[in-house]
Amino acid sequence: TSFERHYLNIPFEYSFIYNHRNSERPFYDITDSTLWAHEVGQLSSLRGSLTQYMDWTNSFFSKNETYTHIPKLVVYYAWKDHKNEDKLWVQAELPVNIVQENLDYRRNVVDTAMNRRTAFFNPRLFMIYYPDENNRQYNQLKFDYRYNSWAQNLTYKINYMDTSNPLEVWMTNPNLPDSHSHFVGFDYNWGIPEKQLRVFFYSNYTYRMNSLCQSMTYDAATGIRTYRPETVNGNWTYYGGFNAS
């Protein structure tokens, strides 16, 4: 006598991630000094006396702390066949990424303290279906969907201009929107083990919204390139394949 069973499990999970990062770039302008008489390898030992040559406009010192809380509800569902093996497996992940960022940024002798709290819902749905219980290894369908959102680098919200390279100007953009992406994946595996016949097909598609990029403006009169972060829509990638053996 055949029978089918349904199983459902809904656990709650929580994870925490802490990240601390220090970075600095002291920039010195020794164009009109006698320091050119020293070998390059000797300059590091003279760092204490180099303060008077510090280019504060293009030097920065930053400290960044990130606290990430991820409460997540997970739904597991299984439809069993009469052999008590999975005929259909569904896994739905429902996490909320709550991120607290603290940035201490010093540039041009000005200290800037910024704080940002963001919360993003990044769900995922994964399914496996076995049409033939007698041929599970060579007959299965897989489906995967993921949605992700994230905020841009907090440093971009500080309004400054980097001119450390005379021919390149790097700007920030405090008005950058958040980025988002959709991913859809599909796999199909079929075969007859007795005849050593196997067919595999896969298809993956990703669509991105507000992808981060660098816009560039070139001034032909001065030869200066100006870069500024922007976001663009419509970026997508697709790859798939087919294999038979």
Identify the function of each model-found stretch.
Residues T1-S245:
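Exposed, low-structure sequence patches enriched in small/polar residues
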